[in-house]
């Protein structure tokens, strides 16, 4: 896999802008992405609802650099193993109680070359789930986001965002 070592204080947009130049993306867009840092995502074990496949930061962290009261812990990038506990996993979601995360090696993905946005009306939640399955099958699971919103929420969008059409 492709990976990058990243400092914990980088904000989501800055990280994606740096990756864009290399044709890569993290494909991790949680709701507070614009205003939060990588270290915070790891410390809180963040999950992004603006994603369809890689929804938790766990899916992206390959190794960590953490400062503890005992000193620096720098894990190595190693393949997944069933040979006992993984020390990195202890720090995911620890909220700073075990140490301060200073950096991480992150799993990256090729940036999509084509971007399409669709606003589709479906008759039921079951139909929306079927639609997502069809989209994922047609794109090789490359769809980066899929949201289901209620009619009430749609009415708010139509009332407050000019030039938005009712699907």
Which residues does each predicted region cover?
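FAD-binding subdomain of flavoenzyme oxidoreductases
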Residues: 2-147
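Terminal amphipathic helices with adjacent charged low-complexity linkers/tails
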Residues: 144-167
């Amino acid at each position: 896999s492709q990976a990058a070592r990243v400092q914990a204080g980088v904000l989501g947009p800055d990280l994606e802008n740096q990756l864009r130049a290399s044709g890569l993306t993290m494909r991790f867009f949680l709701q507070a992405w614009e205003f939060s840092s990588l270290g915070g995502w790891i410390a809180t074990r963040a999950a992004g609802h603006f994603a369809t496949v890689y929804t938790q930061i766990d899916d992206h962290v390959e190794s960590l650099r953490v400062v503890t009261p005992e000193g620096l812990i720098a894990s190595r990038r190693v393949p997944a193993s069933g040979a006992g506990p993984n020390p990195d996993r202890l720090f995911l979601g620890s909220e700073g109680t075990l140490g301060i995360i200073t950096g991480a090696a992150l799993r990256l993905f090729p940036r999509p070359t084509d971007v399409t946005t669709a606003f589709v009306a479906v008759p039921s939640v079951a139909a929306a789930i079927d639609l997502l399955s069809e989209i994922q099958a047609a794109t090789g699971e490359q769809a980066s986001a899929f949201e289901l919103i209620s009619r009430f929420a749609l009415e708010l969008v139509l009332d407050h965002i000019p030039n938005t059409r009712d699907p």
